[in-house]
Amino acid sequence: MSTFQKFIQYYKPYKKVFIFDLICAAFISLVDLAYPQILRSLTKTLFLKDASMILKTLPIIGGILFICYIFQAFCKYYVSCQGHIMGAQMERDMRRKLFDHYENLSFSYYDQHNTGQMMSRLVSDLFDISEAAHHGPENLFISLVKIVGSFIFLFIIQWKLAIILLAIVLLMIFFSAKQNRKMQATFLDNRRKIGDVNASLQDSLAGIRIVQSFANEDIEREKFRVGNEAFLDSKRDNYRAMGSFQSGNTFFQGMMYLVTLLAGGYFIALGQMSAADLAMYALYIGIFISPIQILVELTEMIQKGMSGFIRYQSVIDIESEITDSVDAVNMKHPDGDICYHDVSFSYEDNEIVLNHIDFTIKSGKSIALVGPSGGGKTTICSLLPRFYDITDGLITIGGQNIKDIKLESLRNSIGIVQQDVYLFGGSVKENIAYGNPDATFDEIVEAAKKANIHDFIMTLPNGYDTFVGERGTRLSGGQKQRISIARVFLKNPPILILDEATSALDNESEQHIQKSLDALSENRTTITIAHRLSTIQNADEILVIDGQTIKERGTHEELIASGGLYAKYYHMM
C-alpha cells in the first residue's frame, strides 16, 4: 500500500462529512463561475432590450442569485467549520494510534530513539498532517472545479486564446512538479532537524539539576545552539525552494494576464472577439488564476503534511518485537516455580550478555543476584516480564512457557522496584494508585502504611493529594522509593523483582527501605539484585553472575565458606 493510500484510510470514519464537504466546495465554486457568465449573457441579451423588460427581469435574476449566495454562505460555513473539525478528529485519531503504538513498542525501540523525536511526531508532525488532511482535498477540489470550469468558459468565448493560455499552464505544471521534489526533500530534512532540537531541549531540561550542579550551562547552550543553527540552515534551504516555487508561479500568472491583453487585443482588431468578451475573459482569468495561487500555497501545506505523514508512518510501520503469540493464554500458576532453562541472550549487535543460564526459584522463595556491573543481572530480570525476548532457551512460570502467556497477564503478576524510581507528575495518591487504578482510598492508605510512608505523607501540605513534581522532584530518594514500594504493595503481585532498590540511598534510608522490602517480599517469589551484600544474606539462594554465566551458587554461609568470588566481594565491603 502506497503512502497516499495509507493516508486516505484515515478519511473512512468521516466519509459522509468528507463527501458533503466536497459537495459544498463544488457549490461554492459553481456559484463563483456562474456570475461572469450570467453577466455576459445579460450584456448580450437583456441589457439590449427596453427599460421595462430590464426592470421586470432584474429582480427575478437578483432573487435567484440572492438564494444562491445564501446557500453558498451555508456551504462556506460547513466547509470552514465541519471540515476543520474533521481534520482535528483525524489528528486525534492519528495521535491516539501513534501513542498506542508507542506504548506497545518494546524496550529495544526506546534504547535507540530519544523522547524529543517522539514528541515531535506526536505534536508538530500531526498538526501539519491535520492541516493537509482538511485543507488539502477541499482546496484542491475547489481549485480544480474553478480551473476546469473557467477554462471551459474561456474556450467557449475564444478558443484560440484559451489554447495559448493552456500552453502557459502546462509549462507552469512542469515547473511546479520539478520544484515540488526539491520542496519535499527540504521539508523532510526540516522535520528531522526540529526533532533534533526538541530532543536536545528535552534532554537538557530533564537533566537541568545535573547541568547546574556541574556549572555546565554554557556547554548545554552550545549543544542547543548547534542544533538550532542546523535547523535554521534547513529552514533556509526550505525557504529558498519555496521562494523559487512561488516566484516562478507568480511569473507564469503574470504571463497569463500579459498574453490575455496582447492576444485579446489582437483578436479584437481582427474582429474575432468583442470588447465585452475580453472583459468577461479578464473576469474568468481572475477566477482561473485565483485557484492557481491557492494551489501554490496548498502545495507547501501538502508537502509539509505528507513529510509529517511519512515520519508518522515510519513509526507505525515498526512492529513490536514483543507481542502475544496467537494462542497466548492467561497465566495458569502465577505462584508456581520460576525456571530458567539454558537461557542465552544477546542484543541486536550480537554481543552475548547471557550464556546458557540455568536456575530455578521455588514458589515463595527468594534468590539474589550479585556480581560486577554489566555481568547480566538486570538482563536476567528483564527477561522474565519479557521486556526483551531470550535468544535461546526457555523460561517458565509454573511449568508454563512465558511466551505462551498473555503479556498483560504476565506483567500483572510481576512487581518491580527499581533503583531509579519514576514518579509521574501527579499527586502522591495517583502515583501509589498506579499499582492498581481501581483501588479504593483505604487500600491506597493501607499500602502506604505497609511501605512505612503514610506518616510522612500526612505531614505534607495536602496529604495524599500533594503534587510530587515532575519525576517526583519534591521528594527525597528514600521517600520516592517508599512510594514505589507502596505502589507494588497495592499491585500485590505473586512475583517480585528488586533491582538494586537501596543502592542509591544513605545508610539510614536504606534501613527504613529494607524493612519495607522485607515486608513486601514476604510470601512472594522474589529476585533481588544488590551491590550491598548485607541486604541479601537471608536469601534462600545467591547466584554470582560474571562473564555472562553463573559462577557460583548457594546460601550466604555456603558461599562464604567456599572462599570464592562471593567471599571476595563480601570481605571487600
Model-derived features: positions:
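Juxtamembrane loop-to-helix connectors within ABC transporter transmembrane domains
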Residues: 2, 11, 79, 83-87, ...
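Transmembrane helices of ABC transporter permease
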Residues: 13, 17-27, 65-68, 135-189, ...
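An intracellular "coupling" helix at the cytosolic face of ABC transporter transmembrane type-1 domains
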Residues: 16, 107-108, 124-133, 137, ...
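Transmembrane helix-loop-helix hairpins at lipid-water interfaces of multipass membrane proteins
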Residues: 18-75, 155-160, 271-275
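Hydrophobic alpha-helical transmembrane bundles that constitute the permease/transmembrane domains
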Residues: 22, 26-37, 66-77, 129-132, ...
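Helix-loop-helix
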Residues: 48, 54, 63, 153-167, ...
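Short intracellular "coupling" helices and adjacent cytoplasmic loop segments at the cytosolic face
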Residues: 88, 96-126, 199-223, 227, ...
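ABC-type nucleotide-binding domain
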Residues: 324, 331-573
